[in-house]
A protein has these predicted regions:
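Glycine-rich flexible loops
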Residues: 2-215
Length: 215
């Protein structure tokens, strides 16, 4: 009986994670953040598995069959996205991460090219308080920016090394940018990841507009 209950709970968590991935994809598609099948979304099921979108599917019309159940300690499953290693590395590094959402939105794609690589510092925006741990617009928010790289295993190692370093004198963002590519954002739950994604993308829009009117 105990075994049956455990299996039922595992199945319930898996179904919930799949539903959250589908909802995240639909929300991003409505905002036009994932054009032409771009982007990928994942939600942690348990300590060893995540639900993650497969390659080449429209994120606005995901079906349960478009979601892979990927073990964290196993090779990538067939039909996996080339960017799956970037998700898996973060889940392995930080057990507190419950969901990771990646979009190719205009603001993050353009602003990341302007920055190039290094760090984007955001300061003075009230919306920064939507990020977990930030309580004032006076706190600086540091978003790491990396050069885009088609070798995502190598890129995952670079990201991990940079995150270990932290952000001196600023609050580390729950996300990072790939130049000319887009944003990865995460949170302790799918709801928090969605809030962080929306907040960061909106902050990038603010920053782009502000830079147009300042030398």
């Amino acid at each position: 009986m105990a075994s049956a209950v455990t299996l039922e709970m595992q199945s319930s968590r898996q179904s919930a994670a799949i539903g959250e991935v589908i909802a995240a994809g639909a929300n991003a598609a409505r905002r036009r953040w994932v054009p032409a099948t771009s982007g990928n979304f994942s939600v942690r099921i348990d300590a060893n598995h995540v639900a993650i979108t497969r390659s080449g599917v429209d994120k606005g019309s995901l079906a349960p069959t478009d979601i892979l159940i990927q073990p964290l300690d196993a090779p990538l499953l067939p039909r996996s996205s080339a960017e799956a290693p970037l998700h898996l590395a973060l889940y392995r590094r930080d057990p507190a991460i419950g969901a990771i959402f990646h979009v190719h939105a205009p603001a993050s794609s353009v602003l990341s090219r302007l920055v190039g690589k290094g760090t984007l510092r955001l300061e003075g925006w009230e919306l920064q308080k939507a990020i977990a741990g930030i309580t004032s617009h006076d706190e600086a928010l540091a978003v790491p920016v990396f050069a885009n790289d088609q070798d995502t295993d190598r890129l995952a190692r670079l990201v991990e090394a940079r995150l270990v370093e932290g952000a001196a004198g600023a609050h580390p963002a729950p996300g990072y940018l790939l130049a000319g590519h887009g944003l990865y954002a995460w949170g302790a739950s799918a709801a928090e990841a969605a809030r962080h994604l929306e907040a960061l993308e909106t902050l990038f829009e603010f920053e782009l507009s502000y830079r147009r009117f300042t030398p």
